[in-house]
A protein has these predicted regions:
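Conserved phosphotransfer microenvironments
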Residues: 50-51, 63-95
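Short hydrophobic/Thr-rich beta-strand motif most characteristic of the beta2 strand and flanking loop
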Residues: 29-49, 56, 78
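C-terminal output/effector regions of signal-responsive regulators
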Residues: 148-211
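Alpha4 helix (beta4-alpha4-beta5 surface) of REC/receiver domains from two-component response regulators
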Residues: 80, 84, 95-135
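Receiver (REC) domain switch/output surface
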Residues: 122, 131-151
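Conserved sequence signature across two-component system core domains
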Residues: 9-10, 47, 67
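Conserved acidic segment of CheY-like receiver
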Residues: 2-27
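Short acidic, S/G/P-rich loop/turn micro-motifs used as interaction or catalytic elements
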Residues: 12-16, 50-52, 71-78, 105-109, ...
């Protein structure tokens, strides 16, 4: 399935019932207008705490393309704030998923060290939480459609030759996987996905090198 999965991490109780439907409404409006992205399913999930988000990530079946992370989590001690959580995700979970960071505190109230941590964590966009839902929906859509170009290349290949590719099993690094699973490993930047990309690039260089 062609999909993009968005995970919102925010302790605001209105996220699930009010904000997510508004975001999805805008996302679906934008995807319908695009021949390419109209083929994709956009899914939005919600975790109300950083602790729940870590549990979500611990399940290898939960694929995440975009993280939307709040700054403040009242009373939670898993991390000091959303910035520390973002830093942890980048260093330990996924180096390449898109991250949208927002806060009700106002972006100007984030200190220099925190800004530095966010920039070094390659955050896609910073958004004031008071921004209208349709604008944030646009930001999320933009983040979801600017992913790993290698993934998009494989997805296009899969769209064209999927019927044939799905009849095969691929043995890679000692594991038997489907072509769709290979794409998902790259999306999630896990160990198998990293090895596959490395070998793919090495082979591409060798094939195109004239000796």
């Amino acid at each position: 399935m062609l999909e993009r999965n968005i995970l919102i991490i925010d302790d605001n109780k209105r996220v699930k019932d009010i904000y997510i439907p508004a975001y999805l409404s805008k996302i679906n409006e934008l995807k319908i207008a695009s021949e390419k992205w109209s083929k994709y399913q956009f899914n939005v999930e919600h975790c109300s705490s950083m602790h729940d988000a870590l549990n979500y990530f611990s399940n290898s079946k939960n694929l995440v393309d975009v993280l939307v992370v709040d700054y403040e989590f009242n009373g939670e001690t898993t991390f000091s704030n959303g910035i520390a959580f973002v830093k942890y995700i980048r260093e330990n979970v996924n180096r390449y998923c898109q991250i949208v960071f927002y806060t009700m505190q106002g972006l100007r109230n984030i200190d220099v060290d925190e800004w530095s941590a966010l920039v070094n964590s390659d955050v896609f966009k910073f958004v004031d939480k008071s921004t209208k839902e349709d604008i944030l929906g646009e930001v999320i859509f933009e983040a979801a459609t600017r992913r790993n170009p290698i993934v998009e290349s494989f997805e296009r290949f899969w769209c064209k030759y999927g019927a044939m590719l799905d009849t095969y099993k691929y043995t890679f690094d000692g594991q038997e996987v489907t072509f769709e699973e290979i794409i998902n490993h790259i999306r999630m930047d896990d160990s198998l996905g990293r090895v596959f990309v490395e070998k793919l690039l090495q082979k591409s260089i060798l094939i195109n090198t004239k000796i």
